[in-house]
Amino acid sequence: MVSRILVALDRSPTSHTIFEHTLVLTQAYSARLMLLHVLSSQSSDSPSDPRIMSLGIEGQLSMDWVKSYHDQWAKFEQESLELLKTFEDRAIQAGLETELTQTYGNPGRVICDLAQSWNADLVVMGRRGRSNLTQWFLGSVSNYVIHHVPCSVYLVHP
């Protein structure tokens, strides 16, 4: 029986499709829903690390760049939380018992840890559709989760 569904969402356009699949599943099972977004500097849309972008002539990190990075990261965090709350509002309007969490870390590990601590019966997530070579170099969050999470996984393809 599926009574707890954890959905991992990011800021990609695919997240809307993933959320729609999750709504259907959660309603069908009359399950509780946990919405998760993991803030990671490895996300394709996260602010660039100023250590990479702004080494000065003397190898010093510009304080302007550090402030800019901090401001960009705060905006990224706020926009991500607003999107997650939009999904939460839709789930609540659909009559679903819903929680949300946004945290920092390695997405694969955070998903697996939360699935275990929250006692999820099902994890719903997407995959990026990267090439095998890109997956080999960069890894794959969905591949990590499939092999490490203690419950079933529903994978939404792009």
Regions inferred by a protein language model and the residue ranges of each:
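Short, flexible loop segments at boundaries between secondary-structure elements
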Residues: 151-158
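Glycine-rich, Arg-bearing micro-motifs that act as flexible, cationic patches
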Residues: 122-147
